[in-house]
Amino acid sequence: MNCSPPGSSTDTERQSSSSGTPATPCPTLAPTHPVRQANRLPIRLINMLTAHTGHLLHPEYLQPLSSTPISPIELDAKKSPLALLAQTCSQIGKPDPPPSSKLNSVTSSEKESGRSSSLKLGESPLEDKSSFKPYSKGGETRKESGSSAGGSADKAGFRVPSGSCQPFPHAPSPSSRVSSPGQHCDSKNNESQEKKEPEANKGSLETSQANPTLTRASISNSSAESSQSGDVTPSSKSDPPSLGSGHVAPVSPYKPGHSVFPLPPSGIGYHGSIVGAYAGYPSQYVHGLDHTKTSLVGNQLPGTLGLPGKPPSSSPLTGASPPSFMQGLCRDPYCLSYHNASHLGSSSCSTCVHDPSALKSGYPLVYPSHPLHSVHTTMSSSVTPSLSGHPLYTYGFMLQNDPVPHICNWVSASGPCDKRFATSEELLAHLRTHTALPGADKLLAGYPTSSFGSAASCHLHLPPGGPGSPTTLPGSLSLRSPHTLGLSRYHPYGKGHLTTPSGLPVPSLPAGSYYSPYALYGQRLTSASALGYQ
């Protein structure tokens, strides 16, 4: 075959290129020749066809994982943020390792066995500190929670097992936390028995380790509950119904029905006006406890909680919880979580101990009808519950024979005052002893009339003594002082009735119309409290 000229067909070129030797010696085509360029493949296509795919998939993803349960977090050496996030998510819903290796000083071999047993359960090792524990405070998180639980049990009079004896993990029922720490202090309590138990202890173990605050509260509350019968022996067992519904038990995802905060037992109904005044209905339509009974919530709660030696008017939580738990409670008397439940219908009780701490009202739902509405329409001299005002702010919770219906709502740094007075004049005289504003005379000097000055001194809690009065308490401005304290402030929920004080005549304000700033937010408070968000 003759050598094809440069413009020949590509078939001849393909035939000559496919044969091993050319038919006739012909000059080699240049690389830029169009025939050679037409037969070329793109370099990208060649690379895609001939490239090895090993760099796309790592070998650990191609090979199956070993049969031993290896946590996938260990592949990243627990250093990447994604591994920390996955480790935190993997611990949700799983109990912590058995607490025996954390409570007592055990040998290293027992620590290793405890670590291996926790790994078999699919959990993280003991020394792992990367998981998020909301109630822990640093490095000694779990040891501190376990030892504090044991320490509070020591103070409460429990028989805690000695250091050489490993305590048995808590049983799921909250009552066994009261009486069973020392039941299994024998030679049978070893690692094998420990490995059999965690499946039955998932609920209580998780909350007792992840929530040390609730654990302390529940142990101290149950210790006060069991203080009637002296020390709890290892053989004494209490069945779960004996705890009642007032027991402070931690919330567990495996056990619904336990409440965190102390609740009255189911046999006690709330006073009718507590539901009525908060839900916006008159108390006559809410069938609660009788108005004439003197043994109301303040008298029945301490007995059912098992607190001996407490007067009926004392708080049901007094002495039942550590100070840290008591500080967490709401100190606002308008809140339903307020713990001084003493004078709710117990004013005519002859056995009450009327000390200053017991004089604090439990639920003083004294909501006036409006800031500029006279309280005399609802606080009549006969103290009969009147519904002529706003239906939200009823006084139906008052008893007919209550001699001291007026309550001081002043709140300072030491807590609410909550003193009771028979008349509104005594209440106003008492309010003038609380605080004095420096420069109060300058503030009142700009008001046009003396009647407005007296009314403003009444509503601003300004004593007539001035800044040099001996009753001046600097820095104790109340959280509950009315919103007229800052007349120039913007109040988004206000009606704008006191925004122009200079031209507003207020001669019709009586001396008894002391009101609370909660009247402005009464609608929001009642809706929130009716839903349980207090």
UniProtKB/Swiss-Prot annotation:
Residues 185-200 have a biased composition (Basic and acidic residues). Residues 173-182, 204-217, 230-239 have a biased composition (Polar residues). It is found in: Nucleus; Cytoplasm. Residues 15-34, 115-124, 146-155, 218-229 have a biased composition (Low complexity). InterPro entries: Elbow/Noc_ZnFinger, Tscrpt_rep_NocA-like, Znf_C2H2_type. It holds the Pfam family nlz1. GO terms for biological process: adherens junction assembly; negative regulation of DNA-templated transcription; negative regulation of homotypic cell-cell adhesion; positive regulation of cell migration; regulation of canonical Wnt signaling pathway; regulation of cell cycle; regulation of transforming growth factor beta receptor signaling pathway. Keywords: Cytoplasm, Developmental protein, Metal-binding, Nucleus, Repressor, Transcription, Transcription regulation, Zinc, Zinc-finger. PROSITE patterns: ZINC_FINGER_C2H2_2. Transmembrane segments: none annotated. Disruption phenotype: Morpholino knockdown blocks differentiation of the neural plate border (NPB). A zinc finger (C2H2-type) spans 406-434. Residues 1-35, 90-251, 300-320 are annotated as: Disordered. GO terms for molecular function: zinc ion binding. GO terms for cellular component: cytoplasm; nuclear matrix; nucleus. Belongs to the Elbow/Noc family. Transcriptional corepressor which does not bind directly to DNA and may regulate transcription through recruitment of histone deacetylases to gene promoters. Regulates cell adhesion, migration and proliferation. Involved in specification of the lateral neural plate border (NPB). May be required for segmental gene expression during hindbrain development. This is Zinc finger protein 703-A. It comes from Xenopus laevis. The lineage of its organism: Eukaryota, Metazoa, Chordata, Craniata, Vertebrata.
